[in-house]
């Protein structure tokens, strides 16, 4: 049963990542990989909210599997973040590579902490 929840979440997360990335990149035709950045920060926020909800006792383990492992696991993409950072470096866009690495980690952690804080404030 648990693996079905993960699959169901991933069936939404993977296409959502693809469509969101394409839409953001079309809107922001830039060297910086805004699509992947937006997706990963959003995924961190959702995981933070889910973690806060679980610690408050309002998110079941099944919901964690569906949204956390399935949806967010398929939505977020560390491999694409790494690949895009490497490609920026290889094409001479070292500043953008460094900005991507620093901003992605900082914004992702900030979003995760904000999600936990907001969920705990809401359900505490």
UniProtKB/Swiss-Prot annotation:
MF terms (GO), sorted A to Z: fluoride channel activity; metal ion binding
Record GO cellular component, one term: plasma membrane
Membrane-spanning ranges: 1-21, 30-50, 56-76, 102-122
Localization terms from the record: Cell membrane
Gene Ontology BP annotations: cellular detoxification of fluoride
Regulation: Na(+) is not transported, but it plays an essential structural role and its presence is essential for fluoride channel function.
UniProt keyword annotation of Ion transport present: yes
Pfam families cross-referenced by the UniProt entry: CRCB
Family: Belongs to the fluoride channel Fluc/FEX (TC 1.A.43) family.
Its biological purpose: Fluoride-specific ion channel. Important for reducing fluoride concentration in the cell, thus reducing its toxicity.
Name under which the protein is recorded: Fluoride-specific ion channel FluC 1
Phylogenetic classification of the source organism: Bacteria, Bacillati, Actinomycetota, Actinomycetes, Kitasatosporales
């Amino acid at each position: 049963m648990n693996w079905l929840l993960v699959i169901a979440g991933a069936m939404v997360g993977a296409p959502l990542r693809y469509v969101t990335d394409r839409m953001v990149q079309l809107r922001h035709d830039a060297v910086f990989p805004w699509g992947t950045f937006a997706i990963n920060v959003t995924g961190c926020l959702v995981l933070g909210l889910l973690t806060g909800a679980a610690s408050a006792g309002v998110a079941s383990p099944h919901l964690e599997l569906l949204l956390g492992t399935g949806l967010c696991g398929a939505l977020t993409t560390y491999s694409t973040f790494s690949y895009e950072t490497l490609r920026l470096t290889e094409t001479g866009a070292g500043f953008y590579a460094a900005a991507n690495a620093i901003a992605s980690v900082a914004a992702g952690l900030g979003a995760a902490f904000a999600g936990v804080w907001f969920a705990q404030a809401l359900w505490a």
